[in-house]
Amino acid sequence: MANHEQIIETIKEMSVLELNDLVKAIEEEFGVTAAAPVAVAGAAGGADAAAEKTEFDVELTSAGSSKIKVVKAVKEATGLGLKDAKELVDGAPKVIKEALPKEEAEKLKEQLEEVGATVELK
């Protein structure tokens, strides 16, 4: 069986789409989910529920150690050219995309975090 280092090296070479497929396959195979647990807040009042945010800005706070992979992921997600995507990553913290629906924002956040970026939803 391959050792851990070989597995990690193989994962490092994968594209964002390949990593996404791998995560889905692992979730199906082992019956687990990669989603972070969500803390449930107590009922504070009806106004809070009505004011729940529906649009989010995805902010890249740090590219981490895999800057090249993060630039590629930002380029794919935004449709920017390579130079513009690199400048956006170099200028972190920066908003990558604005006013995204919650599901789309969380998906983009997950994709960027998979390649080593630190991302916040605002």
Swiss-Prot record:
**Function in brief:** Forms part of the ribosomal stalk which helps the ribosome interact with GTP-bound translation factors. Is thus essential for accurate translation.
Answer whether the UniProt record assigns the keyword Ribonucleoprotein to this protein. Answer: yes
By sequence similarity, the record places it as follows:
Belongs to the bacterial ribosomal protein bL12 family.
For the keyword rRNA-binding, the answer is no
Q: What is this protein called?
A: Large ribosomal subunit protein bL12
State any single GO MF term.
structural constituent of ribosome
Q: Name one Pfam family in it.
A: Ribosomal_L12
Q: Which Gene3D superfamilies match?
A: 3.30.1390.10, Single helix bin (1.20.5.710)
Q: Which residues form a coiled coil?
A: none
